[in-house]
A protein has these predicted regions:
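Alpha-helical structural modules in large enzymes and assemblies
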Residues: 1-552
Length: 552
């Protein structure tokens, strides 16, 4: 038996207490680390499905934007993402991607929800202000008529353009049918006809008919609304005029092309001939009456390959071959190629986003002035403005007098048609919109608004800050608070659509989305809306409305 002194017992007790404190501390730290690890694992386990849900919305949005079938998400995108992640970060991280729900039905539902969210955002933006509409009708691959409507409105200091809706039409598609569809949609959305400034359509009777057309129906509920005929469509109609001699050249040229292009054997033989002759092109282009720009491209290609075409037609004993040995015929072909190319350039300049009636009218007026100048030059035998014709006349001996007569008649008829479809209006009266600091009067403004315009033109603060404005609509919306009535008068001119370009462009997307392989697609409007809409979806809001479940 060992006997300890009082001092030794005191030291031993202190040592044991110290050891006990260390043990308790280590146990607490160990337990805390284990508990934190469990919490982290639980947190990761809980947040992973939520992230997978958000990812499924993002992928569905991209699929619709790319206008692809919904099955591509599960059959291609997900396997590709897993393969890339595995290669770069390993299987452990890549396995998390398998929890993203991307089945065909899931992607379809996500697109519908995203489209509905975009639709709600558009309605909220539009319903509180003035807006203009653009609408057109076309037939899809299943012969179903689709009415497509776009809206232009001001939001956050600038004009925006978005698809309002796309609806299938039944029956005869009369003006009453179009109005009932449009009016019903606006009532459901809570939009007021009193806020509709204008409607832009093509020139079909169902749209612009005075008695039973859409125009008559709309004016009965919105008498202040203005209707405009698509400027691009009017330009195409005005461009179709041709005097008999030139029309014969055009029709013969089309028949030449069809003789080669419509027969597969002839097409292959012509390609081989072009290769042997070292031509820059190996094929001709088809002409389509529906495609307005095709005439210029077809004739330009034929003119470039005229030697090859002449050789091919001669070998085939075609009756068309002798035309390509006629210098006057080729000269007329060269002129048609040049004038149609210039008309195509005008047509393309009228296309695009965020255009307005003022800028489009300026381009048409400029072309009309060019026609007048070209007619004067052609009368004097100067064809330098038509480069292909000018080069040909430099090389060949052609009866210029006969050619001048044909060209002058055509240019004069073009001028008449352009004046008919684009009557000289009061475009100059809107110079105050384009140049508010230099044009201080207008016949279009009341005396009171002219006084306000004088105040604005003298406001050097606004004049200095306006240099940073990107467009006319942004400038006039920026002065709405200080000069509300003048701003409204300007926006009443800038807000209306000048063409149905957006509808025509979106019909191309519709044909791509609802093709012969997806002709039974039932969510056409939703897919089309997501594909063309520029408004970002509120994915966080959509996710908050759902219970996150991982894919199994």
């Amino acid at each position: 038996m060992t006997v300890f002194s009082q001092g030794s017992l005191r030291d031993l007790k202190r040592h044991l207490q110290c050891l006990k404190s260390i043990v308790h501390l280590l146990a607490h730290v160990a337990y805390g680390c284990e508990n934190d690890g469990q919490k982290t694992a639980v947190h990761e386990q809980a947040t992973l499905p939520a992230k997978a849900l958000a990812a499924s919305y993002e992928v569905a949005h991209l699929v619709a934007k790319a206008q692809k079938p919904h099955t591509i998400a599960e059959s291609l995108i997900l396997p590709a993402a897993i393969a890339m992640t595995t290669a770069m970060h390993g299987e452990k991280i890549a396995s998390a991607l398998k929890q993203i729900p991307l089945s065909n039905d899931t992607v379809s539902k996500r697109i519908i929800e995203i489209a509905n969210d975009m639709k709600c955002q558009i309605i909220e933006r539009v319903k509180n202000g003035m807006f203009s509409l653009e609408l057109d009708e076309s037939t899809d691959v299943t012969s179903v008529a689709q009415l497509l409507v776009f809206v232009r409105y001001s939001y956050e200091g600038k004009l925006h353009e978005d698809m309002l809706f796309c609806s299938p039409m039944e029956g005869r598609c009369t003006g009453s049918d179009f109005f009932n569809c449009l009016n019903g949609w606006m009532e459901d959305a809570g939009l007021q006809w009193a806020n509709c400034l204008s409607i832009c359509t093509d020139g079909a009777a169902a749209m612009l008919g005075k008695n039973k057309g859409l125009k008559a129906k709309v004016l009965s509920v919105a008498p202040h609304a203005k209707f405009t005929h698509c400027i691009i469509h009017r330009e195409a109609l005005a461009s179709k005029t041709l005097e008999p001699e030139l029309n014969n050249v055009l029709q013969t040229a089309i028949q030449m092309v069809n003789f080669i292009k419509s027969r597969p054997l002839n097409t292959r033989l012509f390609t081989l001939l072009c290769q042997e002759m070292g031509s820059s092109h190996e094929s001709l282009l088809f002409h389509s009456e529906v495609r307005w720009l095709s005439r210029g491209k077809v004739l330009t290609r034929l003119l470039e390959l005229r030697s090859e075409v002449r050789t091919f037609l001669s070998d085939a004993n075609s009756a068309f071959a002798h035309h390509l040995t006629d210098s006057e015929w080729i000269a007329r072909l060269a002129y048609l190629s040049c004038i149609f190319d210039k008309l195509n350039m005008l047509n393309l300049s009228l296309q695009g986003l965020n255009t307005n009636i003022l800028t489009l009218s300026d381009k048409v007026n400029a072309f009309t002035k060019k026609l007048q100048r070209w007619a004067v030059r052609a009368e004097s035998g100067d064809f330098e403005m038509f480069s292909e014709l000018h080069d040909f006349l430099e090389e060949e001996d052609v009866n210029v007098n006969s050619l001048k007569a044909s060209i002058n008649v055509h240019l004069q008829s073009l001028l008449e048609k352009f004046h008919q479809y684009f009557p000289t209006g009061n475009v100059e009266n809107y110079d105050w919109i384009r140049q508010p600091f230099t044009s201080c009067s207008s016949n279009d403004l009341s005396s009171e608004l002219e006084d306000v315009l004088l105040e604005l033109s003298s406001d050097r603060t606004i004049q200095t800050s306006s240099k940073a404005s990107k467009s006319l609509d942004e400038f006039w919306l920026s002065v709405a608070q200080e000069y509300p009535r003048l701003s409204k008068a300007a926006m009443d001119i800038l807000t209306p659509f000048g063409s149905t370009y957006l509808c025509e462009k979106t019909f191309s997307s519709l044909a791509y989305i609802k093709n012969k392989y997806r002709c039974r697609l039932s969510t056409v409007e939703e897919n089309l809306r997501v594909a063309v809409c520029s408004i970002p979806p509120k994915i966080n809001l959509l996710c908050s409305r759902k219970q996150a479940h991982p894919s199994h």
